[in-house]
Design a protein with these regions (language model features):
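Contiguous beta-strand/loop segments that form the cofactor/metal-binding neighborhood of enzyme cores
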Residues: 3-105, 138-153, 174-175, 188
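C-terminal helical cap and adjacent loop that interface with cofactors, partners, or active-site loops
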Residues: 74, 81, 107-189
Length: 189
């Protein structure tokens, strides 16, 4: 949960979706890992964590699921977010960084794929609009957000994780560990 978890918590926390309680399902599949010296060392980290949370949005309790998975077949450092309402939803994944999926309830339930390219980035990127954006462009976005936030020029855009958000993630993960150990939901607020 630790190093991966903050990535999954950043957006919900920034939106004000703070978990009130959590029930955690933690998986420890590998007990050893390579030690970098040709041998094996004990592995004391959780491989996968699914945190079933409840948060308040507009005065109503709604479910919030935060998932971090070291073991995720066919994924390579993939991060995604999916926000679903009764009539609309949106989905984004770093696996398809130029694509946003939008759900709308019409006569049928429809997911539409929008190819937004990388021209909609908060800050200009090195790569031209007709080319595939890469790691250097993503890294540049992070540095630009840090610099803009530091100079007070970020405006309405998301900045870097705050110390308060880091503390909240640690509180959530501590409650998740207790939830797993006690096999019950743990209150946070």
């Amino acid at each position: 949960m630790g190093d991966l978890g903050m990535h999954a918590c950043h957006f919900p926390f920034r939106m004000g979706w703070n978990p009130k309680r959590v029930f955690a399902e933690l998986s420890k599949i590998y007990t050893e890992r390579p030690d970098g010296k040709g041998g094996m060392a004990p592995c004391d980290t959780w491989d996968n964590a699914v945190l079933h949370c409840v948060t308040d949005i507009d005065g109503r309790e709604v479910p919030l699921e935060i998932s971090t998975k070291r073991l995720a077949p066919a994924e390579m450092n993939t991060w995604f977010i999916e926000v679903l309402g009764a009539d609309r939803g949106v989905r984004f994944s770093t696996k398809e960084p130029k694509t946003v999926w939008v759900f709308e309830r019409r006569k049928e339930q429809v997911w539409e794929r929008y190819d937004v390219g990388h021209a909609c980035n908060t800050f200009p990127v090195i790569t031209g609009g007709i080319f595939e954006a890469g790691f250097s462009d993503c890294f540049q976005q992070m540095w630009a957000a840090y610099a803009a936030e530091r100079e007070g020029q970020l405006g309405e855009h998301f900045g870097c994780v705050t110390p308060d958000e880091a503390v909240r993630s640690h509180e959530l993960f501590d409650a998740a560990l207790r939830s797993h150990a006690e096999q019950r939901a743990i209150a946070l607020i």
